[in-house]
Amino acid sequence: MKKAILIIIGAVLFALVLTNLLQSEDYYNLKLEKLKQEHAIKPISSVDHSKFEILQQEFDTPQDVTEACISCHTERHREVMHSSHWNWERISYIEGRGIEASGKSNVINNFCIGAQSNEQACAKCHIGFGMSNNHFDFENARNVDCMVCHDNSEAYIKGAATAGYPDRSVNLSQVAQHVGQPTKHNCGSCHFNGGGGNNVKHGDLEQALLGCDRNVDVHMASNGMDMSCTACHTAENHQMLGKLYSVSSDNTHRATCEQCHTNTPHFDPIINRHNAKVSCQACHIPEYAKVNATKMAWYWSESGKLKDGEPYTVDDEMGNHIYTSIKGSFKWATNAKPDYMWFNGTANLYLLGDTIDEHPLILNNLHGSHDDGESKIIPVKIHVGDQIYDKVHNILIQPKLHGTQKGDSAFWIDFDWPKAAEAGMKQVGLPYSGEYGFVETVMYWPVNHMVAPKDQAVGCAECHTRNNDGRLAQLSGFYLPGRDYNKPLDFAGIFLFFASIGGVLIHAAIRILVSIKKKRYEMNVIDYENEQQI
Protein backbone atom coordinates (compact mmCIF):
# COMPACT_ATOMS: atom_id res chain seq x y z
CA MET A 1 0.00 0.00 0.00
CA LYS A 2 2.83 2.34 0.93
CA LYS A 3 4.58 1.75 -2.41
CA ALA A 4 1.36 2.37 -4.34
CA ILE A 5 0.86 5.76 -2.64
CA LEU A 6 4.45 6.79 -3.39
CA ILE A 7 4.05 5.76 -7.04
CA ILE A 8 0.83 7.81 -7.35
CA ILE A 9 2.44 10.90 -5.75
CA GLY A 10 5.46 10.58 -8.04
CA ALA A 11 3.27 10.26 -11.12
CA VAL A 12 1.26 13.36 -10.14
CA LEU A 13 4.42 15.43 -9.58
CA PHE A 14 5.85 14.26 -12.90
CA ALA A 15 2.61 15.21 -14.68
CA LEU A 16 2.61 18.68 -13.08
CA VAL A 17 6.23 19.33 -14.10
CA LEU A 18 5.60 18.07 -17.64
CA THR A 19 2.45 20.21 -17.98
CA ASN A 20 4.33 23.29 -16.78
CA LEU A 21 7.13 22.71 -19.29
CA LEU A 22 4.86 22.06 -22.25
CA GLN A 23 2.14 24.67 -21.69
CA SER A 24 1.95 27.53 -24.21
CA GLU A 25 1.73 31.04 -22.75
CA ASP A 26 0.11 32.27 -25.95
CA TYR A 27 -2.70 29.79 -25.48
CA TYR A 28 -3.37 30.58 -21.85
CA ASN A 29 -2.72 34.34 -21.87
CA LEU A 30 -6.30 35.39 -22.40
CA LYS A 31 -5.56 39.04 -21.55
CA LEU A 32 -3.04 39.24 -24.39
CA GLU A 33 -5.39 37.49 -26.78
CA LYS A 34 -8.11 39.98 -25.91
CA LEU A 35 -5.75 42.89 -26.62
CA LYS A 36 -4.80 41.38 -29.97
CA GLN A 37 -8.46 41.04 -30.89
CA GLU A 38 -9.18 44.65 -29.93
CA HIS A 39 -6.37 46.06 -32.03
CA ALA A 40 -6.88 43.68 -34.94
CA ILE A 41 -10.12 45.48 -35.74
CA LYS A 42 -9.13 48.71 -37.48
CA PRO A 43 -11.58 51.62 -37.35
CA ILE A 44 -13.32 52.42 -40.63
CA SER A 45 -14.45 55.98 -41.17
CA SER A 46 -18.18 56.46 -41.54
CA VAL A 47 -17.62 59.75 -43.35
CA ASP A 48 -16.47 60.32 -46.93
CA HIS A 49 -15.06 63.84 -46.94
CA SER A 50 -14.77 63.86 -50.73
CA LYS A 51 -18.57 64.15 -50.87
CA PHE A 52 -18.69 67.36 -48.86
CA GLU A 53 -19.45 70.27 -51.17
CA ILE A 54 -17.43 72.71 -49.08
CA LEU A 55 -14.30 70.63 -49.75
CA GLN A 56 -14.94 70.36 -53.50
CA GLN A 57 -13.26 73.65 -54.32
CA GLU A 58 -9.87 74.97 -55.25
CA PHE A 59 -8.35 76.40 -52.06
CA ASP A 60 -6.14 79.45 -52.46
CA THR A 61 -4.46 79.16 -49.06
CA PRO A 62 -4.14 76.46 -46.40
CA GLN A 63 -5.99 78.79 -44.02
CA ASP A 64 -9.00 78.44 -46.31
CA VAL A 65 -8.90 74.69 -45.70
CA THR A 66 -8.89 75.30 -41.95
CA GLU A 67 -11.92 77.57 -42.31
CA ALA A 68 -13.73 74.76 -44.13
CA CYS A 69 -12.79 72.25 -41.43
CA ILE A 70 -14.03 74.31 -38.50
CA SER A 71 -17.27 75.18 -40.30
CA CYS A 72 -18.32 71.61 -39.40
CA HIS A 73 -15.96 70.71 -36.55
CA THR A 74 -16.94 73.91 -34.81
CA GLU A 75 -15.04 73.56 -31.51
CA ARG A 76 -12.15 71.30 -32.39
CA HIS A 77 -9.77 74.14 -33.18
CA ARG A 78 -10.23 75.46 -29.65
CA GLU A 79 -9.09 72.11 -28.27
CA VAL A 80 -6.04 72.16 -30.54
CA MET A 81 -5.17 75.67 -29.40
CA HIS A 82 -4.97 74.44 -25.80
CA SER A 83 -2.53 71.66 -26.68
CA SER A 84 1.25 71.57 -26.35
CA HIS A 85 1.50 70.65 -30.03
CA TRP A 86 0.12 74.11 -30.78
CA ASN A 87 1.63 76.18 -27.98
CA TRP A 88 5.01 74.43 -27.99
CA GLU A 89 4.98 74.49 -24.19
CA ARG A 90 3.07 73.17 -21.20
CA ILE A 91 2.60 74.48 -17.71
CA SER A 92 4.02 72.03 -15.18
CA TYR A 93 5.83 71.73 -11.88
CA ILE A 94 9.61 71.62 -12.14
CA GLU A 95 11.49 70.62 -9.01
CA GLY A 96 13.47 73.57 -7.70
CA ARG A 97 11.58 76.02 -9.91
CA GLY A 98 7.92 75.59 -9.07
CA ILE A 99 5.13 76.04 -11.61
CA GLU A 100 6.63 77.07 -14.92
CA ALA A 101 6.08 76.84 -18.66
CA SER A 102 8.55 74.71 -20.57
CA GLY A 103 8.75 73.56 -24.16
CA LYS A 104 10.26 74.42 -27.50
CA SER A 105 9.75 78.10 -26.74
CA ASN A 106 12.44 78.08 -24.03
CA VAL A 107 14.34 74.78 -23.83
CA ILE A 108 17.76 73.97 -25.25
CA ASN A 109 18.80 70.63 -26.75
CA ASN A 110 22.15 69.37 -27.99
CA PHE A 111 20.98 68.73 -31.53
CA CYS A 112 19.88 71.88 -33.41
CA ILE A 113 20.07 73.78 -30.09
CA GLY A 114 16.68 75.51 -30.10
CA ALA A 115 13.76 76.82 -32.11
CA GLN A 116 13.98 80.41 -30.92
CA SER A 117 15.38 82.71 -33.66
CA ASN A 118 15.06 79.79 -36.10
CA GLU A 119 11.28 79.53 -36.35
CA GLN A 120 11.22 79.87 -40.13
CA ALA A 121 12.87 76.44 -40.40
CA CYS A 122 11.75 74.78 -37.15
CA ALA A 123 8.07 75.52 -37.83
CA LYS A 124 8.11 72.67 -40.34
CA CYS A 125 7.19 70.63 -37.26
CA HIS A 126 4.61 73.04 -35.85
CA ILE A 127 0.90 72.34 -36.38
CA GLY A 128 0.33 75.82 -37.74
CA PHE A 129 0.99 78.22 -40.58
CA GLY A 130 3.12 81.36 -40.61
CA MET A 131 5.52 80.95 -37.66
CA SER A 132 8.31 83.01 -39.18
CA ASN A 133 9.54 84.53 -35.90
CA ASN A 134 8.78 84.65 -32.18
CA HIS A 135 5.76 86.92 -32.73
CA PHE A 136 3.48 84.15 -33.97
CA ASP A 137 -0.21 84.76 -33.15
CA PHE A 138 -1.28 81.73 -31.11
CA GLU A 139 -4.83 83.11 -30.88
CA ASN A 140 -5.50 83.02 -34.64
CA ALA A 141 -7.53 79.85 -35.33
CA ARG A 142 -7.07 80.22 -39.10
CA ASN A 143 -3.44 79.25 -38.67
CA VAL A 144 -4.24 75.83 -37.18
CA ASP A 145 -2.97 73.15 -39.59
CA CYS A 146 -5.59 70.37 -39.54
CA MET A 147 -4.05 68.60 -42.53
CA VAL A 148 -0.65 67.82 -41.06
CA CYS A 149 -2.23 65.43 -38.54
CA HIS A 150 -5.33 64.28 -40.42
CA ASP A 151 -4.23 63.86 -44.04
CA ASN A 152 -4.75 60.24 -45.06
CA SER A 153 -3.60 60.64 -48.67
CA GLU A 154 0.09 60.72 -47.67
CA ALA A 155 0.44 63.59 -50.14
CA TYR A 156 0.69 66.43 -47.62
CA ILE A 157 4.13 67.73 -46.71
CA LYS A 158 5.35 70.90 -45.10
CA GLY A 159 7.75 73.02 -47.10
CA ALA A 160 11.40 73.42 -46.11
CA ALA A 161 11.91 76.68 -44.17
CA THR A 162 8.47 78.01 -45.13
CA ALA A 163 7.33 78.92 -41.60
CA GLY A 164 5.05 75.90 -41.39
CA TYR A 165 3.25 76.36 -44.71
CA PRO A 166 2.74 73.31 -46.94
CA ASP A 167 4.99 72.68 -49.89
CA ARG A 168 3.80 74.41 -53.07
CA SER A 169 3.34 71.03 -54.77
CA VAL A 170 0.52 70.03 -52.39
CA ASN A 171 -2.98 69.87 -53.88
CA LEU A 172 -4.97 71.32 -50.98
CA SER A 173 -8.33 70.21 -52.35
CA GLN A 174 -7.21 66.61 -52.74
CA VAL A 175 -5.79 66.52 -49.23
CA ALA A 176 -8.88 68.14 -47.70
CA GLN A 177 -11.08 65.46 -49.26
CA HIS A 178 -8.95 62.62 -47.85
CA VAL A 179 -8.72 63.25 -44.14
CA GLY A 180 -9.30 60.93 -41.21
CA GLN A 181 -7.77 59.64 -38.00
CA PRO A 182 -4.01 60.29 -37.65
CA THR A 183 -1.75 57.54 -38.97
CA LYS A 184 1.90 56.65 -38.47
CA HIS A 185 2.71 58.77 -41.52
CA ASN A 186 1.20 61.85 -39.90
CA CYS A 187 2.96 61.48 -36.57
CA GLY A 188 6.18 60.33 -38.18
CA SER A 189 6.43 63.32 -40.50
CA CYS A 190 7.73 65.22 -37.47
CA HIS A 191 8.65 62.70 -34.79
CA PHE A 192 10.68 60.42 -37.06
CA ASN A 193 12.73 63.33 -38.39
CA GLY A 194 13.54 65.41 -35.31
CA GLY A 195 17.03 66.89 -35.20
CA GLY A 196 17.29 67.30 -38.94
CA GLY A 197 16.92 63.77 -40.29
CA ASN A 198 15.53 60.27 -39.96
CA ASN A 199 16.11 58.70 -36.52
CA VAL A 200 18.57 61.43 -35.54
CA LYS A 201 17.10 62.23 -32.12
CA HIS A 202 15.19 59.35 -30.60
CA GLY A 203 16.85 56.23 -31.93
CA ASP A 204 13.62 54.28 -31.51
CA LEU A 205 11.39 56.40 -33.76
CA GLU A 206 12.13 56.35 -37.46
CA GLN A 207 10.73 55.86 -40.94
CA ALA A 208 11.41 52.10 -40.87
CA LEU A 209 8.44 51.78 -38.50
CA LEU A 210 6.13 52.61 -41.40
CA GLY A 211 6.75 49.16 -42.88
CA CYS A 212 8.73 47.06 -40.43
CA ASP A 213 8.38 43.44 -39.29
CA ARG A 214 7.91 42.12 -35.75
CA ASN A 215 11.64 41.89 -35.12
CA VAL A 216 11.79 45.68 -35.27
CA ASP A 217 8.61 46.46 -33.34
CA VAL A 218 5.87 44.03 -32.35
CA HIS A 219 3.23 46.74 -32.10
CA MET A 220 3.80 48.68 -35.33
CA ALA A 221 4.88 45.76 -37.53
CA SER A 222 3.09 45.51 -40.86
CA ASN A 223 3.00 41.72 -40.47
CA GLY A 224 1.82 42.04 -36.88
CA MET A 225 -0.68 44.30 -35.12
CA ASP A 226 0.15 47.26 -37.40
CA MET A 227 -0.88 49.64 -34.64
CA SER A 228 -0.99 53.39 -35.11
CA CYS A 229 0.67 55.82 -32.74
CA THR A 230 -2.70 56.95 -31.40
CA ALA A 231 -3.53 53.42 -30.22
CA CYS A 232 -1.31 54.19 -27.22
CA HIS A 233 -1.02 57.97 -27.44
CA THR A 234 -4.72 58.66 -27.23
CA ALA A 235 -5.90 62.23 -27.74
CA GLU A 236 -9.03 63.04 -25.77
CA ASN A 237 -10.04 66.54 -26.85
CA HIS A 238 -6.73 66.81 -28.71
CA GLN A 239 -4.75 66.45 -25.46
CA MET A 240 -2.19 63.85 -26.46
CA LEU A 241 -1.24 61.19 -23.92
CA GLY A 242 2.53 60.98 -23.60
CA LYS A 243 5.58 62.98 -22.60
CA LEU A 244 8.87 63.75 -24.31
CA TYR A 245 11.37 64.43 -21.55
CA SER A 246 13.52 66.76 -23.60
CA VAL A 247 10.75 69.34 -23.12
CA SER A 248 8.54 67.91 -20.33
CA SER A 249 9.16 67.64 -16.62
CA ASP A 250 6.29 66.14 -14.60
CA ASN A 251 4.88 62.68 -14.00
CA THR A 252 1.39 63.23 -15.39
CA HIS A 253 -0.50 62.40 -18.56
CA ARG A 254 2.01 59.73 -19.59
CA ALA A 255 1.45 56.84 -21.97
CA THR A 256 2.44 53.58 -20.28
CA CYS A 257 2.65 49.89 -21.14
CA GLU A 258 0.48 49.10 -18.12
CA GLN A 259 -2.52 50.96 -19.52
CA CYS A 260 -3.00 47.94 -21.80
CA HIS A 261 -0.88 45.14 -20.33
CA THR A 262 -1.59 45.79 -16.59
CA ASN A 263 1.00 45.43 -13.81
CA THR A 264 0.91 41.62 -13.96
CA PRO A 265 1.24 40.58 -17.62
CA HIS A 266 3.26 37.40 -16.96
CA PHE A 267 2.32 33.99 -15.58
CA ASP A 268 5.48 33.83 -13.51
CA PRO A 269 4.94 35.83 -10.30
CA ILE A 270 8.70 36.33 -9.94
CA ILE A 271 8.82 38.17 -13.27
CA ASN A 272 5.73 40.18 -12.35
CA ARG A 273 7.42 41.29 -9.12
CA HIS A 274 10.15 42.91 -11.21
CA ASN A 275 7.56 45.46 -12.32
CA ALA A 276 7.84 47.22 -8.96
CA LYS A 277 11.35 48.43 -9.83
CA VAL A 278 11.94 47.58 -13.49
CA SER A 279 10.07 49.14 -16.41
CA CYS A 280 8.62 46.96 -19.15
CA GLN A 281 10.90 48.69 -21.64
CA ALA A 282 14.06 47.68 -19.76
CA CYS A 283 13.44 44.01 -20.57
CA HIS A 284 11.49 44.21 -23.81
CA ILE A 285 13.68 46.68 -25.76
CA PRO A 286 17.13 45.08 -25.78
CA GLU A 287 18.25 47.24 -28.74
CA TYR A 288 17.25 50.40 -30.57
CA ALA A 289 18.21 51.91 -33.94
CA LYS A 290 17.60 48.45 -35.37
CA VAL A 291 17.34 49.53 -39.01
CA ASN A 292 18.84 52.98 -39.51
CA ALA A 293 21.56 54.65 -37.46
CA THR A 294 20.86 57.20 -34.75
CA LYS A 295 23.05 60.13 -33.79
CA MET A 296 24.92 59.56 -30.51
CA ALA A 297 27.19 62.63 -30.48
CA TRP A 298 27.13 66.10 -32.03
CA TYR A 299 30.07 68.51 -31.71
CA TRP A 300 29.22 72.07 -32.73
CA SER A 301 32.74 73.22 -31.86
CA GLU A 302 34.04 71.60 -35.05
CA SER A 303 31.56 73.32 -37.37
CA GLY A 304 32.39 76.16 -39.72
CA LYS A 305 35.22 74.56 -41.67
CA LEU A 306 35.20 75.34 -45.40
CA LYS A 307 36.90 73.98 -48.51
CA ASP A 308 37.78 76.59 -51.09
CA GLY A 309 35.44 78.94 -49.27
CA GLU A 310 32.47 76.58 -49.52
CA PRO A 311 30.75 74.33 -46.96
CA TYR A 312 31.18 70.57 -47.36
CA THR A 313 30.09 67.23 -45.94
CA VAL A 314 31.82 63.92 -45.17
CA ASP A 315 29.85 60.65 -45.06
CA ASP A 316 30.61 57.25 -43.56
CA GLU A 317 30.25 53.95 -45.44
CA MET A 318 26.53 53.82 -44.58
CA GLY A 319 25.84 57.27 -46.02
CA ASN A 320 25.51 59.02 -42.65
CA HIS A 321 27.03 62.48 -42.36
CA ILE A 322 29.97 62.38 -39.97
CA TYR A 323 30.85 66.00 -40.70
CA THR A 324 29.03 68.99 -42.14
CA SER A 325 30.29 72.54 -42.18
CA ILE A 326 26.99 73.90 -40.92
CA LYS A 327 26.65 71.54 -37.92
CA GLY A 328 30.00 70.01 -37.01
CA SER A 329 30.98 66.37 -36.48
CA PHE A 330 28.81 63.43 -35.46
CA LYS A 331 28.94 59.87 -34.16
CA TRP A 332 26.31 57.28 -35.07
CA ALA A 333 25.22 53.85 -33.84
CA THR A 334 23.00 51.01 -35.04
CA ASN A 335 21.63 48.07 -33.04
CA ALA A 336 22.60 50.04 -29.97
CA LYS A 337 22.28 48.58 -26.48
CA PRO A 338 20.57 51.11 -24.17
CA ASP A 339 22.04 52.58 -21.04
CA TYR A 340 19.92 52.29 -17.90
CA MET A 341 18.94 54.67 -15.13
CA TRP A 342 16.40 55.18 -12.37
CA PHE A 343 13.48 57.41 -13.36
CA ASN A 344 10.37 58.52 -11.47
CA GLY A 345 8.73 60.44 -14.30
CA THR A 346 9.99 63.90 -13.34
CA ALA A 347 12.86 65.90 -14.77
CA ASN A 348 14.66 69.20 -14.49
CA LEU A 349 15.30 71.05 -17.74
CA TYR A 350 17.86 73.62 -18.78
CA LEU A 351 15.88 76.69 -19.84
CA LEU A 352 17.12 79.70 -21.78
CA GLY A 353 19.08 81.97 -19.46
CA ASP A 354 19.90 79.35 -16.81
CA THR A 355 23.40 79.53 -15.36
CA ILE A 356 25.72 76.65 -16.21
CA ASP A 357 26.43 74.98 -12.86
CA GLU A 358 27.93 71.61 -13.86
CA HIS A 359 30.34 70.11 -16.36
CA PRO A 360 29.28 68.41 -18.48
CA LEU A 361 25.97 70.24 -18.50
CA ILE A 362 22.97 67.89 -18.32
CA LEU A 363 20.18 69.48 -20.33
CA ASN A 364 17.40 67.22 -19.02
CA ASN A 365 18.21 65.70 -15.67
CA LEU A 366 15.93 62.69 -15.17
CA HIS A 367 15.10 62.24 -11.49
CA GLY A 368 15.01 58.92 -9.69
CA SER A 369 16.76 56.50 -7.36
CA HIS A 370 16.34 53.01 -5.97
CA ASP A 371 15.05 54.43 -2.69
CA ASP A 372 12.39 56.49 -4.45
CA GLY A 373 9.18 54.47 -4.38
CA GLU A 374 8.06 55.89 -7.74
CA SER A 375 11.26 55.09 -9.64
CA LYS A 376 11.88 52.27 -12.07
CA ILE A 377 14.87 51.27 -14.16
CA ILE A 378 14.37 52.49 -17.72
CA PRO A 379 16.45 52.18 -20.91
CA VAL A 380 17.84 55.42 -22.30
CA LYS A 381 19.83 56.73 -25.20
CA ILE A 382 22.57 59.04 -23.92
CA HIS A 383 23.41 61.76 -26.43
CA VAL A 384 26.54 63.83 -25.88
CA GLY A 385 28.08 66.81 -27.59
CA ASP A 386 29.10 70.40 -27.13
CA GLN A 387 27.57 73.76 -27.93
CA ILE A 388 28.21 77.45 -27.78
CA TYR A 389 28.00 79.37 -24.50
CA ASP A 390 28.72 82.85 -23.16
CA LYS A 391 31.98 82.80 -21.18
CA VAL A 392 31.12 85.92 -19.19
CA HIS A 393 27.44 85.36 -18.37
CA ASN A 394 28.02 81.59 -18.11
CA ILE A 395 24.85 80.69 -20.00
CA LEU A 396 24.17 78.72 -23.16
CA ILE A 397 23.77 80.81 -26.28
CA GLN A 398 20.78 80.48 -28.57
CA PRO A 399 22.39 81.29 -31.93
CA LYS A 400 20.66 82.28 -35.10
CA LEU A 401 21.26 79.33 -37.40
CA HIS A 402 18.80 79.64 -40.26
CA GLY A 403 18.78 82.49 -42.73
CA THR A 404 17.81 83.25 -46.29
CA GLN A 405 20.72 85.33 -47.54
CA LYS A 406 24.32 86.22 -46.80
CA GLY A 407 24.80 88.97 -44.31
CA ASP A 408 21.78 88.28 -42.09
CA SER A 409 24.01 86.78 -39.34
CA ALA A 410 22.73 83.20 -39.77
CA PHE A 411 25.51 80.73 -38.98
CA TRP A 412 24.40 78.26 -41.66
CA ILE A 413 25.09 80.92 -44.28
CA ASP A 414 27.74 83.27 -42.88
CA PHE A 415 29.63 80.79 -40.64
CA ASP A 416 30.32 83.57 -38.14
CA TRP A 417 29.69 82.48 -34.53
CA PRO A 418 29.95 85.97 -32.93
CA LYS A 419 27.34 87.42 -35.30
CA ALA A 420 25.06 84.39 -35.01
CA ALA A 421 25.31 84.51 -31.22
CA GLU A 422 24.57 88.22 -31.04
CA ALA A 423 21.58 87.98 -33.40
CA GLY A 424 20.10 84.95 -31.66
CA MET A 425 20.47 86.29 -28.12
CA LYS A 426 19.00 89.62 -29.16
CA GLN A 427 15.89 87.89 -30.46
CA VAL A 428 15.36 85.90 -27.24
CA GLY A 429 16.02 88.96 -25.09
CA LEU A 430 19.17 87.75 -23.34
CA PRO A 431 22.55 89.47 -22.99
CA TYR A 432 25.61 88.48 -25.00
CA SER A 433 29.07 89.51 -23.78
CA GLY A 434 30.88 88.99 -27.05
CA GLU A 435 33.00 86.17 -25.61
CA TYR A 436 32.01 82.63 -26.44
CA GLY A 437 33.29 79.10 -26.04
CA PHE A 438 31.93 75.57 -26.18
CA VAL A 439 30.74 73.45 -23.26
CA GLU A 440 30.06 69.71 -23.13
CA THR A 441 26.38 68.81 -22.90
CA VAL A 442 24.43 65.61 -22.23
CA MET A 443 20.83 64.61 -22.94
CA TYR A 444 18.89 61.53 -21.89
CA TRP A 445 16.31 60.10 -24.29
CA PRO A 446 14.06 57.41 -22.77
CA VAL A 447 13.69 54.45 -25.15
CA ASN A 448 10.03 53.39 -25.48
CA HIS A 449 9.62 51.98 -28.98
CA MET A 450 11.08 49.12 -31.04
CA VAL A 451 9.65 46.53 -28.64
CA ALA A 452 11.10 43.10 -29.47
CA PRO A 453 9.24 39.78 -29.66
CA LYS A 454 9.07 38.12 -26.24
CA ASP A 455 11.62 35.45 -27.16
CA GLN A 456 14.14 38.25 -27.76
CA ALA A 457 13.59 39.93 -24.38
CA VAL A 458 16.57 40.60 -22.13
CA GLY A 459 17.63 37.40 -20.38
CA CYS A 460 17.99 37.10 -16.60
CA ALA A 461 21.75 36.56 -16.77
CA GLU A 462 22.26 39.76 -18.78
CA CYS A 463 21.51 41.76 -15.62
CA HIS A 464 22.07 39.28 -12.78
CA THR A 465 25.75 38.77 -13.54
CA ARG A 466 29.09 39.81 -12.07
CA ASN A 467 30.55 40.47 -15.51
CA ASN A 468 31.52 44.07 -16.11
CA ASP A 469 29.50 44.12 -19.31
CA GLY A 470 26.22 43.30 -17.55
CA ARG A 471 23.38 45.59 -18.57
CA LEU A 472 23.04 47.06 -15.07
CA ALA A 473 26.74 47.16 -14.25
CA GLN A 474 26.71 50.97 -14.09
CA LEU A 475 23.70 51.22 -11.75
CA SER A 476 24.76 51.29 -8.11
CA GLY A 477 23.31 52.02 -4.69
CA PHE A 478 21.21 48.88 -4.39
CA TYR A 479 21.70 45.13 -4.02
CA LEU A 480 21.20 43.13 -7.21
CA PRO A 481 21.20 39.34 -6.71
CA GLY A 482 23.77 37.60 -8.86
CA ARG A 483 25.75 40.82 -9.35
CA ASP A 484 26.59 42.25 -5.95
CA TYR A 485 28.45 41.06 -2.86
CA ASN A 486 27.09 41.64 0.64
CA LYS A 487 29.36 40.15 3.32
CA PRO A 488 26.70 39.52 6.01
CA LEU A 489 24.26 38.18 3.43
CA ASP A 490 26.91 36.10 1.67
CA PHE A 491 28.12 34.72 5.03
CA ALA A 492 24.55 33.88 6.02
CA GLY A 493 23.98 32.15 2.69
CA ILE A 494 27.22 30.16 2.90
CA PHE A 495 26.50 29.27 6.53
CA LEU A 496 22.99 28.10 5.70
CA PHE A 497 24.30 26.10 2.73
CA PHE A 498 26.90 24.23 4.74
CA ALA A 499 24.59 24.03 7.75
CA SER A 500 22.01 22.37 5.51
CA ILE A 501 24.59 19.90 4.22
CA GLY A 502 25.78 19.33 7.76
CA GLY A 503 22.22 18.83 8.93
CA VAL A 504 21.63 16.30 6.19
CA LEU A 505 24.86 14.44 7.05
CA ILE A 506 24.14 14.48 10.78
CA HIS A 507 20.59 13.33 10.17
CA ALA A 508 21.86 10.56 7.90
CA ALA A 509 24.47 9.53 10.47
CA ILE A 510 21.86 9.39 13.21
CA ARG A 511 19.59 7.32 10.99
CA ILE A 512 22.46 4.93 10.24
CA LEU A 513 23.46 4.64 13.91
CA VAL A 514 19.87 4.12 14.97
CA SER A 515 19.47 1.50 12.26
CA ILE A 516 22.63 -0.32 13.38
CA LYS A 517 21.56 -0.14 17.00
CA LYS A 518 18.10 -1.40 16.09
CA LYS A 519 19.55 -4.34 14.18
CA ARG A 520 21.82 -5.21 17.11
CA TYR A 521 18.86 -5.06 19.44
CA GLU A 522 16.81 -7.27 17.13
CA MET A 523 19.71 -9.74 16.92
CA ASN A 524 19.99 -9.82 20.70
CA VAL A 525 16.26 -10.45 21.00
CA ILE A 526 16.47 -13.30 18.50
CA ASP A 527 19.45 -14.81 20.35
CA TYR A 528 17.61 -14.54 23.65
CA GLU A 529 14.49 -16.19 22.23
CA ASN A 530 16.58 -18.97 20.77
CA GLU A 531 18.23 -19.59 24.14
CA GLN A 532 14.84 -19.76 25.84
CA GLN A 533 13.65 -22.34 23.34
CA ILE A 534 16.70 -24.51 23.96
Predicted regions and their residues:
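Alpha-helical scaffold segments in carbohydrate-active enzymes
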Residues: 148-152, 189, 279-289, 462
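Feature representing long, continuous alpha-helical segments
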Residues: 230, 255-258, 278-281, 458-461, ...
